[in-house]
Amino acid sequence: YLGSDRYRELEGGDPPIDTEGYITDEPVLIDDETIDILQETANIGILTGRPAAEASIALDRMRFSIPAAHQFTMDDWDEGKPHPWALQTLADRLEAETIVFAGDTLDDVRTAVNADTADESRTYHGVGVLTGGLSGDAGQDAFESVGAYAVIDSVNDLTDLIR
């Protein structure tokens, strides 16, 4: 995934295979216009299951500028998703009353549902995005079965939800 050079840089050893890597060719799923609208209309935080170094590369490729205090990666907390702690902490740091947390896994939605249950002072909405392993009617049903507030085809549809 990282490619040989980045693997050596980030992991500190030789990669199991010599390859260019996928990380720089991975499709960027969000349009520049969506990024602009989101940054103009909402406080943005990132909660990802990726390691910090990989998340940084992805954010740079999307040209998202998000303060470190508004980012949580797999390196930042032991529990991981769907534990609500990181999302609740982001909500505190963003001083948000309502949180829309979008992701392409069931655990993303579960994280928001769990945070909504655990934190009575805020409202959390988990939004399923059909761009990961879940797609079509089966993906829609799966997200709804774990309590999704909404299910969207693309992260670019988020702007319609938050306006």
What are the functions of these language-model segments?
Residues L38-E40, S65-P67, D119-Y124:
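Short helix-terminating capping/connector loops at secondary-structure junctions
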